[in-house]
């Protein structure tokens, strides 16, 4: 099964609309063919309309970094998945470790968000990953497997096949430490095996699994060479146009 690689940059809480506009203008015409690789940027909510407007007609996919699981109502400070779709958003990142840690998001919240994203015609990038303590205790596979199963519960096989799952070991995010090629392959295969157990091998063969955690232009090719790594969710190295383009210049 040939899965199209997907490299997505997560800007986190960086860039104002002017900076976002300059970035997209710098990369839009230089992106590789969408037949070869999918390129995306997860922009802060206040940058989304700018990024979507400048990216229009290019190969750049646009993701939100979060949404709520209701479309409207008395939910002060939340972002509506319905409105994200209306403005043209393609993907929504959910379950990032920073959201789980700082904002106390649960597996149940993430599952509800996944359902809301599909209900509104977008696709989720579902993040999972273990702490250093869990990793060193040898419980990474068990922990991540439970996160994946919980996030996908109640989705249809078709929805799961269209999902993107990003494995990001928490101990490698923004720390300069990165998982070895073997670790990345092993854990991305764990993700795929959990999908196979829950939804069947055919679905597991279609779902795209990204690795995230200190991915840079210098190491992206080694991760992309892994049979179960279908892309990367990249933080710091996606903030500069030149670096983002270099991430896309790998040979699978």
From Swiss-Prot:
Which pathway does it serve? Carbohydrate biosynthesis; gluconeogenesis; Carbohydrate degradation; glycolysis; D-glyceraldehyde 3-phosphate from glycerone phosphate: step 1/1
Binding residues annotated for substrate, in chain numbering: 10-12, 174, 214, 235-236
> What reaction is this protein's catalytic activity?
D-glyceraldehyde 3-phosphate = dihydroxyacetone phosphate
Protein's name in the database: Triosephosphate isomerase
Name its cellular compartments: Cytoplasm
The record describes the protein's role as: Involved in the gluconeogenesis. Catalyzes stereospecifically the conversion of dihydroxyacetone phosphate (DHAP) to D-glyceraldehyde-3-phosphate (G3P).
Instruction: Tell me the keywords, alphabetical order.
Output: Cytoplasm, Gluconeogenesis, Glycolysis, Isomerase
Q: Which Pfam families match?
A: TIM
Q: Which InterPro entries match?
A: Aldolase_TIM, TIM_sf, TrioseP_Isoase_bac/euk, Triosephosphate_isomerase, Triosephosphate_isomerase_AS
The catalytic activity of this protein is classed by the Enzyme Commission as: 5.3.1.1
Gene Ontology cellular-component terms listed: cytosol
Source organism (scientific name): Streptococcus pneumoniae serotype 2 (strain D39 / NCTC 7466)
Cite the active-site annotation: 96 (electrophile), 168 (proton acceptor)
Top-rank taxon of the source lineage equals: Bacteria
Subunit field text: Homodimer.
